[in-house]
Amino acid sequence: MKISTVFVLAAFNRLHKKMNVLYHDYAKSVGLSDAAFWLLYSLYEYGQPCTQKDLCSAWFYAPQTINSALKSMEEQGLVSLELAPKSRKNKQIFFTEAGKVLIEEKIVPLVNAEELSFERLDEQERSQLLEITQKHIEVLEQEIAKIE
């Protein structure tokens, strides 16, 4: 690996970490754990109804993580779980009124900030960011698969 690649990769990794810290700090500032924050964010983004399986697939969380966060949120009166039609096992997740209020107060403002920040990039920059990030993830997956 070239020295310049090492420095660029280190800078990229710091930026990635900084992005994670931004979300972690925001979640903490509004009184949410990371898992609860991302679960609420996911439910808002995904729309209702959805299942735990949908969330695990969309956000790459372990089922146990989603299950624990959902149980806690159900106990807090933020979500309700109901059996999906024609299912004996899969439950759909619905916001309660308290959950809807929490989403409007804590998640929607962040989503709006994300959208505003993304809109400050021009259309070509947004497209390039997505394309390059996707390509990097695909290549990294391939390289990791070689060492596993």
What does each model-identified segment do?
Residues 21-65:
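N-terminal helix-turn-helix DNA-binding core of bacterial DNA-binding proteins
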